[in-house]
From Swiss-Prot:
The keyword Oxidoreductase applies. Gene3D superfamilies: B-lactam Antibiotic, Isopenicillin N Synthase, Chain. Its cofactor is Fe(2+). Pathway: Antifungal biosynthesis. Residues 165-273 form the Fe2OG dioxygenase domain. It comes from Aspergillus rugulosus. It is an enzyme of class 1 (oxidoreductase). Belongs to the iron/ascorbate-dependent oxidoreductase family. This is 2-oxoglutarate-dependent dioxygenase ecdG.
Length: 338
């Protein structure tokens, strides 16, 4: 997998900009090397967030019910998602529990009194705010460099104005052990609804489409957090005029038997446009981003029927999705993804 230096992006180094261009047009993802002071701060943030993840999931069940993500706003960017309420991989229920923190309530002064979260969040609010701010800085840099490298107009940056309310959030995911006999399995194959997703994980499980073989490949985690994985989503494709390739991915149990017996934790920073940003989808239809976001999240929540197996790109499905994924990426007849 291609690696791009955070320091190189800051400096505008030609090698890293070229690698970013290739990742945008061909692969849909890259590893961000945390090799500068800003990157080292992100590494420290991830260490803190990993410890916070375990603390937040120790929240008593009655409190989790109070802060259920479906009760806390139409965008579903805050609160707890229980295990197994959506479709997972391989025709099973999903295999993860999730807690979400909204960026607006941490970074925008106009929203800071609206935060609804368990006491653990308020106990660490200052540190969580710092972490969110550092993630935001990294994402703004990546979007700026993509805009420059692809000679895009200002639409991408204008849709991610940091002073305006967005649908960006930080997700904490916990995957309990999932043996073959489990009724739960990872996460259904999909593209992310937003623009970027910045990931750190404690073990294998995430799979992406290898642009050379056009088949699933595991993404190796980085235990020392020297790299973060960056994936591109639907809105980066839309706001680049269809040029950027979104990353189709899924989560299944690790192929390492020892890891399958343990609990997996993942941090996911979901970069999404401003609530009122206007995007144009693959069909040429214009959407206010907040409405598009709710539409796709609603698709994830709907039970999938056998007759819906070809509903790409909304919901590629587990073991049935490879033909549709190739069609979606323009690869059914060997056409380059670029």
């Amino acid at each position: 997998m291609a690696s791009i230096s955070y320091d190189g992006l800051l400096r505008g180094a030609a090698k890293d900009i070229q690698t970013l261009t290739e990742a945008s047009l061909v692969h849909g993802y890259f590893n961000l090397e945390l090799d500068c002071p800003e990157g080292k701060q992100l590494r420290e943030d991830v260490l803190f967030l990993e410890s916070f993840t375990k603390e937040i999931f120790d929240t008593p069940s009655p409190q989790k019910t109070i802060y259920d993500f479906k009760k806390l706003g139409r965008f579903r960017t805050t609160g707890f998602k229980p295990l197994g309420i959506e479709e997972g991989a391989k025709g099973k229920s999903d295999g993860f529990e999730m807690f979400m923190l909204p960026q607006n309530e941490l970074l925008l002064p106009s929203h800071q009194d609206k935060l609804q979260s368990p006491s653990a969040v308020f106990s660490h609010r200052a540190t969580l705010t710092r972490c969110m701010s550092n993630y935001d800085a990294a994402s703004q840099l990546i979007l700026r460099r993509i805009t420059e490298s692809l000679n895009l107009d200002n639409a991408l940056l204008a849709a991610h104005n940091p002073s305006e309310p967005s649908v960006t959030n930080l997700g904490f995911l916990r995957y309990p052990p999932q043996p073959a006999t489990s009724e739960n399995c990872g996460h259904i194959a999909h593209t992310d609804v937003g623009t970027l997703t910045i990931l750190a994980a404690t073990q294998r499980g995430l799979q992406v489409i290898n642009s050379e073989t056009q088949d699933w490949t595991f993404v190796d985690p980085h235990p020392q957090n020297e790299f973060l994985l960056v994936q591109f989503g639907d809105c980066l494709k839309f706001l680049s005029g269809g040029r950027v390739v979104p990353s189709i991915h899924r989560v299944i149990p690790s192929d390492n038997p020892e890891e399958r017996e343990g609990t997996k934790y993942t941090l996911a920073y979901f970069v999404r446009p401003n609530e009122e940003a206007v995007i144009k989808d693959d069909r040429g239809e214009e959407w206010v981003y907040g409405d598009y976001h709710c539409r796709k999240f609603g698709a994830f929540a709907r039970p999938l029927k056998e007759g819906d197996r070809d509903r790409m790109p909304d919901r590629p499905v587990g073991e049935y999705d490879m033909i549709n994924i190739r069609k979606f990426k323009g690869l059914a007849d060997g056409v380059s993804a670029a």
